[in-house]
């Protein structure tokens, strides 16, 4: 399949959007014919747990809709990275890729504090409010796009291919090469 659909086990609110139990989520994750795991997502059993990783191929490979064969280097044009990350239990870990205009608006309780490196005490932002804001941002990303910049702005761009022929002076990462 070129779009692994996942059925929600329970009602959930992500950001400002409500998803009902039983809703089938379009992930855009590709699963090659005959494969036991999604493309670009190595699965292993370790320390008593199933662990799933992500490799470059999750974004930079796809399954051909007609032949059902893997096309390495082609972008996964419908991979829904924003929705997948918003559904994660701690999308705030990726807040540097969301639209964050500072943290003062998220400070709800001034008794929750941290001591800074210079010995001062500063209030901590509300983690649930930040999670909600990050999720709202990620839900706006169109499928086939990803934000790889760490600039506190939401500026996803289309997932590129990883072919380099004819791309000179740009490499697979998009940066100019000498």
Regions found by a protein language model. Name each.
Residues 1-178:
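Periplasmic c-type cytochrome electron-transfer domains
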């Amino acid at each position: 399949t070129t779009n692994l659909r996942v059925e929600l086990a329970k009602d959930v609110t992500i950001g400002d959007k409500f998803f009902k139990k039983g809703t089938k989520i379009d992930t855009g994750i590709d699963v090659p014919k005959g494969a036991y795991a999604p493309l670009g997502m190595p699965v292993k059993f370790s320390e008593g747990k199933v662990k799933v990783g992500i490799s470059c191929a999750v974004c930079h490979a796809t399954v051909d809709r007609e032949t059902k064969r893997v096309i390495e280097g082609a972008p996964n044009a419908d991979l829904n990275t924003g929705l997948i990350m918003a559904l994660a239990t701690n999308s705030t870990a990726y807040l540097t890729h969301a639209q964050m205009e500072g943290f003062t608006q998220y400070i709800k309780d001034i008794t929750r504090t941290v001591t800074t490196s210079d010995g001062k005490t500063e209030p901590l932002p509300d983690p649930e409010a930040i999670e909600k804001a990050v999720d709202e941002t990620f839900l706006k990303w169109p499928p086939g796009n990803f934000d790889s910049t760490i600039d506190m702005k939401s500026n996803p761009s289309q997932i590129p291919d990883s072919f380099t022929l004819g791309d000179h002076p740009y490499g697979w990462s998009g940066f100019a090469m000498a």
